[in-house]
């Protein structure tokens, strides 16, 4: 078995995702691995009148700029490993798996919010979907309180 040299870390900028990134950074340091830090912007798929398209595009462009800056900030605070920021739009469940294939990820690291019961059934679990469909092992990190 070869140890992973390419890690994909999915972030939604939550505390749980930041803990997953810290775990991945520690792991990457020990394995001399590279990290691809991915954020997925969910874009609603609904019919929008032509007038609203410009507003929606402006909002998406603004969100992309903000999320790029946040990814760069997360990476710059962890200079001990090579982190490449990746920003995509779409359904996170699909995009995470697609990007894992694109970058040749050998391990996906992501946080889990630990939703239970009805909320989990209604919302679904991104982590659970990724575990089922990923082309490589997936390490999920539960948020812990200090």
Q: What annotation goes with each model-predicted range?
A:
Residues 1-3, 23, 30, 75-108, ...:
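Structural beta-alpha unit
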Residues 2-54, 146:
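Small/aliphatic-rich secondary-structure junction motif
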Residues 25, 72, 128:
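Active-site phosphate/pyrophosphate- and oxyanion-stabilizing loops and adjacent acidic/basic residues
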Residues 36-38, 84-88, 139:
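General small-molecule cofactor/ligand-binding pocket signal
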Residues 44-45, 95, 117:
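Generic structural signal for helix capping and beta-alpha/helix-loop junctions
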Residues 55-69:
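A short acidic, glycine-rich active-site loop
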Residues 66, 87-91, 113:
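Short beta->alpha linker loops
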Residues 99-146:
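Gly/Ser-rich helix-loop-strand patches that form or flank binding pockets
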């Amino acid at each position: 078995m070869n140890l992973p040299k390419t890690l994909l870390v999915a972030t939604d900028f939550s505390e749980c995702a930041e803990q997953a990134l810290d775990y991945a950074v520690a792991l990457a340091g020990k394995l001399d691995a590279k990290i691809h830090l991915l954020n997925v912007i969910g874009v609603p798929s609904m019919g929008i009148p032509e007038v609203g398209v410009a507003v929606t595009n402006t909002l998406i462009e603004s969100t992309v700029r903000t999320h790029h800056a946040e990814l760069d900030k997360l990476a710059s605070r962890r200079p001990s490993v090579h982190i490449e920021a990746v920003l995509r739009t779409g359904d996170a469940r699909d995009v995470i798996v697609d990007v894992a294939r694109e970058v040749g990820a050998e391990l996906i690291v992501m946080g889990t919010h630990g939703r239970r019961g009805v909320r989990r059934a209604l919302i679904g679990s991104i982590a659970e979907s990724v575990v089922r469909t990923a082309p490589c092992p997936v390490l999920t990190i539960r948020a812990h309180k200090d």
